[in-house]
From Swiss-Prot:
Region (Flexible loop): 100-110
Catalytic activity: L-methionine + ATP + H2O = S-adenosyl-L-methionine + phosphate + diphosphate
GO biological process: one-carbon metabolic process; S-adenosylmethionine biosynthetic process
Gene3D superfamilies: 3.30.300.10
GO cellular component: cytoplasm
Keywords, in A-Z order: ATP-binding, Cytoplasm, Magnesium, Metal-binding, Nucleotide-binding, One-carbon metabolism, Potassium, Transferase
Phylogenetic lineage: Bacteria, Bacillati, Actinomycetota, Actinomycetes, Bifidobacteriales
Protein name: S-adenosylmethionine synthase
């Protein structure tokens, strides 16, 4: 008997300590972009027992009340009492922000404000180099309606629902920290065929009975999400459910584990289905190609799959600091291209998509304060108008470029 091919992916809730830090960093970024869309921001957050440290580099015409932003984010997540391990109103907040290095800035902003206002679009695109070197990846596949890998999409939906039932009180006695994990069986053609395991770990009040909790989460979180996402496309009549496998989960959040911005990069992207260049997203303005180019690569990949040119695709793009044009662009279709060659798809991508940093920022409208909502439950596969990199607005152009 052939060995089963089982693929897993995890997600975490907004109360996970690393995600708390991501949300703080992106809330600070949004506040600065709201005041000055040209802000250059690279903000990291670290969390430990009752204490947050915010540090990094910022160049902006705006002023942000960092202390208030931190407390607001923590409060909205649900850490409002020492009873749950963290009190937004009494936790310590230490801030250490400096200006962006002028050597980095000179490669990103070669035009002064007056020069930029007079420059043509092409001049602006050529003048703005990448904020750093690096390799970024984007991915899409036809396993789900949102063209994401099924394991990570399902894990995100479960994590989001877990937070929903906590906040609404539909399932009482839950606390903010939590994680989900999904295992899917694939056939020899790499198609998902069966749900194997659902794992949910959630922080809770001390008096909670674990058997009761498993029943509640199965009824109010797991089954509704599975019925909505899987429907009839993947077998899910029999699967294993694990809830808090170690037993109790009372102490959570930063009181149990230190948190740090950028430490959930696989959760943020494709759950391990694609490569990752290593650069995190949260706290970085769009001049940082770690973020903007990864968003653009997803945009490219999603349009390729939406155009029916391949069943799955990974787009790699690389940059040199201070240089506008990508050093390289590569499209990998894993032999799943449909009626075209991989080379034809790659040539079409080069014709249709301008992947210079300033062009990406313009095309995807990335200088807006939209990033807080990206900081939990995934940056990709979200059906939200502000997630412009999820638009399939280049499908027709790709098809025409293939014909040319």
């Amino acid at each position: 008997m052939a060995e089963l091919k089982l693929i897993s992916a995890e997600s975490v809730t907004e109360g996970h300590p690393d995600k708390v830090c991501d949300q703080i960093s992106d809330a600070i970024l949004d506040d600065m972009l709201a005041q000055d869309p040209h802000s250059h921001v690279a903000v990291e957050t670290c969390a430990t027992v009752g204490q947050f440290f915010v540090f990094g580099e910022v160049t902006s015409e705006g002023y942000s009340d960092i202390q208030n932003i931190v407390r607001s984010v923590v409060r909205n997540i649900g850490y409002t009492s020492s009873r749950v391990g963290l009190d937004a109103d009494s936790c310590g907040v230490t801030v250490s922000l400096t200006e962006q290095s002028p050597e980095i800035n000179q490669g990103v902003a070669r035009l002064s404000g007056e020069e930029e206002s007079k420059a043509s679009r092409e001049q602006r695109y050529e003048a703005q180099g990448a904020g750093d070197q690096g390799v970024m990846f984007g991915y899409a596949c036809d396993e789900t309606d949102v063209l994401m890998p099924l394991p990570i999409h399902l894990a995100h939906r479960l994590a989001y629902r877990l937070a929903e039932v906590r906040k609404s009180g539909e399932v009482p006695h839950l606390r903010p920290d939590g994680k989900t994990q999904v295992t899917i069986e694939y056939d020899d053609d790499d198609h998902p065929v069966r749900l194997d395991t659902v794992l949910v770990s959630t922080q809770h009040d001390p008096e909670v009975d674990q058997a009761w909790l498993k029943e509640q989460l199965t009824e109010h979180v797991i089954r509704p999400v599975l019925d909505d996402v899987l429907a009839d496309r993947v077998a899910h009549d029999e699967y294993r459910v694990l809830v808090n496998p170690t037993g109790s989960f009372i102490l959570g959040g930063p009181a149990a584990d230190a948190g740090l911005t950028g430490r959930k990069i696989i959760v943020d992207t494709y759950g391990g289905a694609a490569h990752h260049g290593g650069g995190a997203f949260s706290g970085k303005d769009p001049s940082k190609v770690d973020r903007s180019a990864a968003y653009a690569a997803r945009w490219v990949a999603k349009n390729i799959v939406a155009a029916g040119l391949a069943h799955k695709v990974e787009v790699q793009v690389a940059y040199a600091i201070g240089v506008a044009d990508p050093v390289s662009i590569n499209v990998e279709t894993y032999g799943t291209e449909i009626g075209v060659t991989r080379e034809q798809i790659q040539q079409a991508v080069r014709k249709v998509f301008d992947l210079r940093p300033a062009a990406i920022i313009d095309e995807l409208d990335l200088k807006r304060p939209i990033y807080s909502k990206t900081a939990a439950y995934g940056h990709f596969g979200r059906e939200d108008a502000d997630f412009t990199w999820e638009a399939t607005n280049k499908v027709d152009e790709l098809k025409e470029a293939i014909k040319a």
